[in-house]
Regions:
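NTP/phosphate- and nucleic-acid-binding module
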Residues: 1-75, 80-93, 100-101, 107-636
């Protein structure tokens, strides 16, 4: 039998007999790899380990620690859960059961209504199936045979899925023990590879997401390569629930979402303090980095949105009105207005770069089911900036933006990583321009010392972009900042500048946001800090608490002095026990509490309690004020 050449990830080449399975190749490399491998990527395509090599190929084995490995574990876990449900509830009809970002689910058609106690029983059955270590066997069937098999089982959803496949589609099933499911795969070699799992919740879901179809029951779960990783993830979920910005937003009286305005946040006085501090900081930083601030109207003519392309490509997300018998739209983006500001007068190369920032309120229609606190809303303030420049200035400007982003995120203690998205298939512009601009982004990041990963073909059709993903205090990532090169809008709006040669030239433009959305960024900060904001952001920075009425005058004078200095101080002069006052201040996550009793009045001091630490001792009034002012100024 002829041999085939296998090119491995490290570039080495191994010869094996044609017809050798991928699992055999893995075992031939090492017993450890043979035990760990879940899948193999053959010439860029994920394959089961039972697949045979019939020709030369590049092969990379997928292990549990990789993202592909985790996806395979969760995909297989969905099948195991379905098998367990079939054992316990034989009348169940199965719809779809994919792996998703943080786990898996299966949509089920069954008269029995699932309750949390059912999940416990299903988990026990899953454990039996995992322990049995059943092999998952792939089969490819003719369409007619596949249709008959699932029709005989009265699996109408599978029949519908098969009928929707193209005539030339490969139809495959996976069998583990007594359970067979329609699936393209690939899967783990056996059920025993799913080492740690947890069923999490029950929800409703319309078949194919269409409310005209039947409502099915959906069971969510997750799976990990080890119990330690599962436990860490479940702990993170518990911590995330404790930090939920919707819960804390209510407890700390920051914002609310009313039924009279779903998706339109109401900010309360405490929330406005945080919002205004973020805006003040944004303005201070941008002034230092050479930005000018503009403001464009919220409602603009349909003609503008036709020029920008939004009317044709974004119309379903826009709120439209009629004024003087003409169509207008509430802006979903700030960019077109920024183009009009640039065009108000001619520009010379000597003026470039022009950095124009805008804190613009935009409105976008979101389906009600997608709304989520401050994270997914219908109106938000986007901290846009548009930078107009010559091609020769791209690299320097990108670095300038990265430097600004780095400073801002460091202020909040947020680490980040960058992702570069490159030219998609449906791009505009020529290959040379794309290569030049993409290389400028790469060079800017590399010279700055910024590590990045590349998302091939994931850029916008009008230019490459860099996305900044922030990591919060419990390890979750949030995409916030974006640097987007745009070769389309300057063309559409016929933007020009006069070059050194006296001729008209087209400027290059960068869109960029650092917060992304102020509302969403506030939500992220609430959860990152668990509501315990640093002093510079805290709605109330210090509470002054006299123990009895005889300490009131001293406390009042101190409070007034701090108020005059611009500190956010609250005098708690209620007729309550001091322990109660302290407890309430702790629940409100106030950074500092000043307790005033006989000794403090006599000595001209304050008894200082710091959030999270408790009593830190007595201080002179002026020393405490100086300490707090320094902490606020340093944004600690």
């Amino acid at each position: 039998m002829a041999n085939v050449k296998v090119t491995l990830k490290d570039g080495s080449v191994k010869e094996v007999a044609a017809g050798t399975t991928l699992l055999e190749v893995a075992k031939g490399l090492s017993q450890k790899l043979g035990k760990q491998a879940l899948l193999a990527v053959v010439d860029g395509v994920n394959k089961d380990l039972t697949d045979k090599l019939e020709h030369d190929a590049s092969v990379e084995f997928v292990v549990p620690e990789s993202s592909e490995g985790l996806h395979a574990i969760r995909h297989t876990a969905a099948h195991i859960m379905a098998q367990a449900i079939q054992h316990l509830f034989p009348d169940t009809k199965f719809a779809i059961g994919p792996a998703i970002a943080n786990g898996f689910y299966y949509d089920l058609d069954i008269e029995h209504l699932f309750f949390p106690e059912d999940l416990i029983a299903i988990e026990k059955e899953i454990a039996k199936i995992v322990k049995a270590n059943l092999p998952l066997v792939r089969s490819e069937l003719p369409r007619s045979e596949a249709l008959k098999m699932f029709a005989d089982k009265d699996e109408k959803y599978k029949v519908e899925l098969i009928n929707d496949l193209p005539e030339d589609a490969v139809i495959s099933t996976y069998t583990q023990g007594d359970f067979t499911d329609l699936c393209a795969g690939p899967h783990c070699p056996s059920t025993g590879r799913v080492k740690a799992f947890k069923l999490q919740s029950i929800a409703g879901a319309y078949w194919r997401g269409d409310e005209k179809n039947k409502m099915l029951q959906r069971i969510y779960g997750t799976a990990f390569p080890s119990k330690e990783e599962l436990d860490a993830y479940l702990h993170m979920l518990e911590e995330a629930a404790r930090r939920d910005h919707r819960k804390l937003g209510k407890e700390l009286d920051l914002f609310s979402i009313m039924e009279e305005g779903p998706g339109f946040p109401f900010f309360h006085p405490n929330g406005m303090v945080i919002r205004n501090e973020l805006i003040n900081y944004w303005r201070e930083v941008h002034r230092r980095y050479g930005y000018q601030e503009i403001k464009t109207p919220m409602i603009l003519s349909r003609k503008l949105w036709e020029t920008s392309g939004h009317w044709d490509h974004y119309r379903e997300n826009m709120y439209v009105t009629e004024i003087d018998n003409e169509d207008y739209a509430i802006k979903p983006m700030n960019c077109p207005g920024g183009m009009l500001v640039y065009k108000t007068h001619p520009h010379s190369y000597r003026e470039l770069p022009i950095r124009a920032g805008e804190l613009g309120l935009v409105h976008r229609h979101e389906l009600s089911g997608a709304l989520h606190g401050l994270f997914r809303v219908r109106c938000f303030t986007q901290d846009d900036a548009h930078i107009f420049m010559m091609p020769s200035q791209i690299k320097d400007e990108i670095q300038n933006v990265i430097r600004l982003f780095d400073e801002v995120y460091a202020t909040f203690g947020l680490k980040y990583h960058a992702e570069l998205s490159t030219r998609p298939e449906d791009s505009m512009g020529d290959a040379e321009t794309w290569e030049t601009t993409t290389n400028a982004l790469k060079s800017a990041m590399e010279d700055f010392g910024l590590d990045y990963v590349i998302n091939e073909g994931d850029g916008a059709f009008y230019g490459p972009k860099i996305d900044f993903h922030l990591t919060d205090s419990i390890g979750r990532t949030w995409q916030c900042g974006t640097i987007q090169l745009d070769m389309l809008l300057p063309e559409k709006f016929d933007l020009t500048y006069t070059g050194e040669d006296g001729l008209k030239h087209r400027p290059v433009m960068i869109h960029r946001v650092v917060y992304g959305s102020i509302e969403r960024f506030i939500g992220i900060l609430i959860e990152n800090y668990a509501g315990a904001f640093p002093a510079w952001l805290a709605p109330c920075q210090v509470r002054v608490m006299p123990i009895t009425d005889k300490h009131y005058e001293y406390a009042k004078k101190l409070s007034d002095e701090m108020f005059k200095l611009g500190l956010r101080v609250y005098l708690d002069d209620r007729n309550e026990k001091i322990g109660y006052k302290i407890r309430e201040a702790q629940l409100q996550k106030v950074p500092y509490m000043l307790v005033i009793g006989d000794k403090e009045v006599e000595d001209g001091t304050v008894a200082v309690r710091r959030r999270g630490e408790g009593d830190i001792g007595a201080m002179k009034q002026e020393d405490f004020i100086a300490m707090l002012q320094e902490e606020i100024a340093d944004k600690k």
